[in-house]
C-alpha cells in the first residue's frame, strides 16, 4: 500500500494513467553577443504562447469552477506578464549572455525557492503555482509538447509526479476519477481545486510514480489515506462497502449544511470559515459557514513588487463583503513578518523574526501601511458586515494606540464624504501568552477576541513547530495551552464580550467538545471541516461538554487529558 497526504476525501476504483512529460533540459551555455536579440525574442515568443494557453485555461476554469477559481489563472497570467519578471529575464540574457530558457528558469526558480523557505504552509505551497507558470513558459520556449488532460477518453485514476493548478483545471471530469501525486501538500491550489470538485486525491506520496505502472488497477482510498495497487477481490469488496458508507455519511452531513450549530440542550455557537481571498467564499458557503472568522489579508501583499494601494485593498475587501452578504467577516490586518517577508520592504536581519518586527509592530512603525489598510477596510464596511482584527497584540497600550489611529481615519473619511460602518467592531487576536494573561484588561478595550492557537501554542510551549527535532512537543491540547484558552474565554465573558478561535484547533474534531464546554462562542476553520464539526456540536449536550471541560482542565498531562476526552467521545458515540 501507498500513503501520502490526504488532499481531498473520497474513494475511487480504476485503471492507472501514469503521466510523464518530456524532460525539460536547460541549455546553460553562454551565448555570443550577436545571439542576444534572438534569445530575447525566443523568450517573448514563448511567453506569448504561454499567455494564450493560460487564457484558454482560465476560460475553462471559469466554466468548470466559477469565477473564484478563474481568478487563480488570472493571477498566473499577471505573474507571467509581470514587467519586473520580464526585465529580470531579459537582463540575464543581455548582461550574462544566458539562453532564454536558462534565464527564465533562474528567475522563476528564485521566486519559487523564496516562497518555499517561508514557514506558512499556504504561502509555501504557492511555489507550486510559480513553478507551474515557469514550466509552461519553458516548454513553450523550448518547443516541447504540453499534455492535454481534457482529451482523456477512458475512466482513469491519474498518477503523476505532480499536478499543477493549470493541469487540474483541464481535467475531463467525466473520465478522471481521482489523482495521486509524488509531490504536493494539503493547502496547494491543486488540492484546494480537488476539494472544490470533490475529486478524491492523495498527494505527497513521495514515490507513487515509481510504484505504479500504466494500466495497474488502483483503489484510491482518500478516506483512510491508502492507495492499493492491483488489490485482491476481497480488498475490492471491503473498499466498495467503505465507499457506500462514505457516500451515506456525506449525504447525512450535507443535510446539516444550513442548520445552526446548536447542542441538544439548546446552546448555540457559530461555525465559520477561514479564507485567504474572495475565491474561498464559494467553498465556505457550500459547506454551511455562518460567516468568515478569519480573512487573511496578507496574501494581497505577496507576489508583488510594491505595497498594494488603498484602492486595490478596498476593491478586494469590498468583493469579499459583497460575496458574504449579511454574514460577518473578520478582516485581520496584515500579519507580515516572521515567516512572511516582503522583498520590497527591506526587512532587517533578525536573530528571531517570529519575536521581531512583524504584524502590528510594522503597522505602528509604518503608519502609512496601517492607514491605507484600515481606511480600505472601513470603506468596504459600507458594503457588508466587516469587523477589524489586529494580530500579535501584547499590551493594552498597543490596542489604545490602534484605536486612536482608527478614529483619525474615520474622521478623514467623514470629511471626504466616504461611507463606512460607524459601529464597526474592533477585535484582537490572542496568540501570545502576554495577551492571554491580561485578557481581562484587553476585553475592556475591544469588542471581541479570536484565539490564534497555532502561535499561542508555539509561544506558550517554547516550541518551534517547524523544527522536526522537537515538533512532537507541539501539543495544542496540552493543559498549559488549554488553561490559557479558558482564561481568555472567561475574561471576555466577564466583560460581556465574545471569543472565537481561528487556529487549527478550532477544526480539530478531538477538541470540539472540550472547546464547546469551555465556552468558546465561535469556531472558525477550513471550510471542508465545517459539516463534521456541526454534526459533533448538534449531537451533544452543552452541560455534558462543560463537565468534560472542567475535568479535562484539571488533568496534569496531555495524555491523561486526551484519555478523558476520548473516553467521553466513545461513551457518548458522538463523532
UniProtKB/Swiss-Prot annotation:
GO CC, any one term: cytoplasm
Transport as UniProt keyword: yes
Keywords of this entry: Cytoplasm, Kinase, Magnesium, Metal-binding, Phosphotransferase system, Sugar transport, Transferase, Transport
Chain positions recorded as phosphoenolpyruvate binding sites: 296, 332, 454-455, 465
UniProt xrefs under Pfam families: PEP-utilisers_N, PEP-utilizers, PEP-utilizers_C
Names of the cofactor(s): Mg(2+)
Residues of the active site: 189 (tele-phosphohistidine intermediate), 502 (proton donor)
Keyword Nucleotide-binding part of the UniProt annotation: no
Positions in coiled-coil regions: none
Residue numbers binding Mg(2+): 431, 455
A GO molecular-function annotation: kinase activity
Source organism superkingdom: Bacteria
Protein location: Cytoplasm
Domain statement: The N-terminal domain contains the HPr binding site, the central domain the pyrophosphate/phosphate carrier histidine, and the C-terminal domain the pyruvate binding site.
PANTHER family: PHOSPHOENOLPYRUVATE-PROTEIN PHOSPHOTRANSFERASE (PTHR46244:SF6)
Note: The reaction takes place in three steps, mediated by a phosphocarrier histidine residue located on the surface of the central domain. The two first partial reactions are catalyzed at an active site located on the N-terminal domain, and the third partial reaction is catalyzed at an active site located on the C-terminal domain. For catalytic turnover, the central domain swivels from the concave surface of the N-terminal domain to that of the C-terminal domain.
Role: General (non sugar-specific) component of the phosphoenolpyruvate-dependent sugar phosphotransferase system (sugar PTS). This major carbohydrate active-transport system catalyzes the phosphorylation of incoming sugar substrates concomitantly with their translocation across the cell membrane. Enzyme I transfers the phosphoryl group from phosphoenolpyruvate (PEP) to the phosphoryl carrier protein (HPr).
NCBIfam families named among the record's database cross-references: PRK11177.1, PTS_I_fam
Family: Belongs to the PEP-utilizing enzyme family.
The protein, known as: Phosphoenolpyruvate-protein phosphotransferase
Native source organism of the sequence: Salmonella typhimurium (strain LT2 / SGSC1412 / ATCC 700720)
